[in-house]
Curated annotation (Swiss-Prot):
Pfam families hit by this protein: SRP68
Gene name per UniProt: SRP68
Protein name per its UniProtKB record: Signal recognition particle subunit SRP68
Stretch forming the signal peptide: none
UniProt keyword annotation of Cytoplasm present: yes
Residue stretches of biased makeup (Basic and acidic residues): 31-40
Length: 622
């Protein structure tokens, strides 16, 4: 990757030729960043390069490393655009290729005659990257401000223009073959993105296919380490190609696009929102043929389009969750499904007017039979609560695995049994809400099934409460709770009968019974050892002395706390100790000293009458 020297300051008028791309933080950190990005790469270390030598530039590696280090790891395109502007300015200053000064702009173009240093190619590449990052920033903002889409397309065209300029420069004989191919692939990629935004599917797929072909050839021509970057770019392009193929008329592409949702992190870039819209559009077409749904022996009509779309995608969503490769993907799919379900429930609620609720709650004089719309609402609520239970159960499984493993980093907080107790509390609350659904009060099979599920999760909740008591050595409480777990589990085994199919997706209670029996044996042994330790005569080596170590050097004591972070070594802060103070001296002889009289030395005060008083008023008194 090309490197830059540290350039002090950050001002200057250079780098203004990219069309306003450096507006955010143009001078921020230009002098404070400690990097070597502007140094001449190893391929061109001589100052006076002979024309027979080849210039080389790792285009894909440079942009990928820059993007990951300057904002795109978190989707911050504005930060990356500012970085491109600052790097351009540093390159122009290093190469003495400034666009005039702060008072006057003088446009300069990189020509073939200047290609004595690959940093001139890097300068054009940063122009294209700056325009592209600005376009992606505008794409994020265009969701709320549609007018910014026109500016987005303008920036993409600018990026393609700079990429074409880079490709033209790389056609020079001074540039090696690999750089030429990378420049062609980069131009094809940006061109495909522009056509994609214009919805010119045929031109877009041609550009993406060209880009994919070049990167595949480059990946096959180099070592595995170098090929990883090219293969990663090919994977990024593939969803765009399938989406374009679907819009051209390839109906089989929709299945591959659906599978792409199962990848960890999902699709990104231009395709993320378009893929979701495509799936919704496909389901909307299928929803036109859906008129009713059957649940627990009752068929109800479905007239709300949003509900039809959700119910049609229900099976696909459940299959996607089952096939998810990672926990992050599974959690994302759970959240997406719950969000769609909440929207469908809200659409049904809007149809359920308060007066219609009261009027339609009973039909044909049959008490307990709710209206079709209310029953549909109960069905959607059942789906939402069941999905929430499955999600929390999946989270509980992950916490159980983490609880059984030793933490690799002691500084990180490891999971505790209390975390699992909270999850099972939420699950039990969801089961209580299921029992209260309108229209299912007289469904004995449903009530029995939910009752058995409640017992299963109560058993697991009780088990982890017992585990938390074991940690604080409350043996009797833990033993009672283990017995309660066995009671719940035995009730499930005895009453399951015909409901075993509905309970097969739940945690195995037989495995829980085996684990509880093992834990009870360990608990009883630990309780006996603890009791025997407490009854042993206390010796100097067994008594835990609260004195700090500095005060008991003469006594041998096995104190495990001395090797922990809370070792009691000294008193801190130190206690107060009495110290001698400065003595006080009292002059006792002074009380017995007789001083000579002073009456003869004091002036006798003479009495004055009214005359003296008047003189004193007017100031004549001497």
């Amino acid at each position: 990757m090309a490197a830059e020297k540290q350039v002090p300051g950050g001002g200057g008028g250079g780098g203004g030729g990219g069309g306003g791309g450096g507006g955010s933080g143009g001078g921020r950190g230009a002098g404070g960043e400690e990097n070597k990005e502007n140094e001449r790469p190893s391929a061109g270390s001589k100052a006076n390069r002979e024309f027979g030598d080849s210039l080389s530039l790792e285009i894909l590696q440079i942009i990928k490393e820059s993007q990951q280090q300057h904002g795109l790891r978190h989707g911050d395109f504005q930060r990356y655009r500012g970085y491109c502007s600052r790097r351009q300015r540093r390159l122009r200053k290093t190469l003495n290729f400034k666009m005039g000064n702060r008072h006057k702009f003088t446009g300069k173009k990189v020509t073939e005659d200047l290609l004595t240093d690959n940093r001139y190619l890097l300068l054009v590449l940063m122009d294209a990257e700056r325009a592209w990052s600005y376009a992606m920033q505008l794409k994020q903002e265009a969701n709320t401000e549609p007018r910014k889409r026109f500016h987005l397309l303008s920036r993409l065209r600018k990026a393609v223009k700079h990429a074409e300029e880079l490709e033209r420069l790389c056609e020079s004989n001074r540039v090696d073959a690999k750089t030429k191919l990378e420049a062609q692939a980069y131009t094809a990629y940006l061109s495909g993105m522009l056509r994609f935004e214009h919805q010119e599917w045929k031109a877009a797929i041609e550009a993406f296919n060209k880009c994919k072909t070049i990167y595949e050839k480059l990946a096959s021509a180099f070592t595995e380490e170098q090929a990883v970057l090219y293969n990663q770019r090919v994977e990024e392009i593939s969803p765009n190609i399938r989406y374009c193929a679907y819009n051209i008329g390839d109906q089989s592409a929709i299945n591959e696009l659906m599978q792409m949702r199962l990848r960890s992190g999902g699709t990104e870039g231009l395709l993320a929102e378009k893929l979701e819209a495509l799936i919704t559009q496909t389901r909307a077409k299928q929803a036109a043929t859906m008129s009713e749904v059957e649940w627990r022996g009752r068929t109800v009509p479905v007239k709300i389009d949003k509900v039809r779309i959700f119910l049609l995608g229900l099976a696909d969503n459940e299959a996607a969750i089952a096939q998810a490769e990672s926990e992050e993907t599974k959690e994302r799919l759970f959240e997406s499904m719950l969000s769609e379900c909440r929207d469908a429930i809200q659409a049904v609620r809007e149809e359920l007017k308060p007066d219609q609720k009261q009027r339609d709650y009973t039909l044909d004089g049959e008490s307990g039979k709710v209206s079709n719309l209310q029953y549909l609402h109960s069905y959607l609520t059942y789906i939402k609560l069941s999905t929430a239970i499955r999600r929390n159960e999946n989270m509980a499984k992950g916490l159980q695995k983490a609880l059984q493993q030793q933490p690799e980093d002691e500084s990180k907080r490891s999971p505790r049994p209390q975390d699992l107790i909270r999850l099972y509390d939420i699950i039990l609350q969801n089961l209580v809400e299921l029992l209260q659904l309108p229209g299912l009060e007289e469904d004995r099979a449903f009530q029995k099934e939910i009752g058995l599920k409640t017992l299963v999760f109560k058993a697991y909740r009780c088990f982890f409460i017992a585990q938390s008591y074991v940690l604080v050595k409350k043996w009797s409480e833990a033993l009672v709770l283990y017995d309660r777990v066995l009671k719940y589990a035995n009730e499930v085994n005895s009453d399951a009968g015909a409901f075993r199919n509905s309970l097969k997706d739940l945690p195995d209670v037989q495995e829980l019974i085996t684990q509880v029996r093992s834990e009870k044996c360990s608990l009883q042994a630990a309780a006996i050892l603890d009791a025997s330790d407490s009854h042993q005569p206390e010796t100097s080596s067994q008594v835990k002395d609260n004195k700090p170590l500095v005060e008991r050097f003469e006594t041998f004591c096995l104190d495990p706390s001395l090797v922990t972070k809370q070792a009691n070594l000294v008193h801190f802060p130190p206690g107060f100790q009495p110290i001698p103070c400065k003595p006080l001296f009292f002059d006792l002889a002074l009380n017995h000293v007789a001083f000579p009289p002073l009456e003869d030395k004091l002036e006798q005060k003479t009495k004055s009458g009214l005359t003296g008083y008047i003189k004193g008023i007017f100031g004549f008194r001497s």
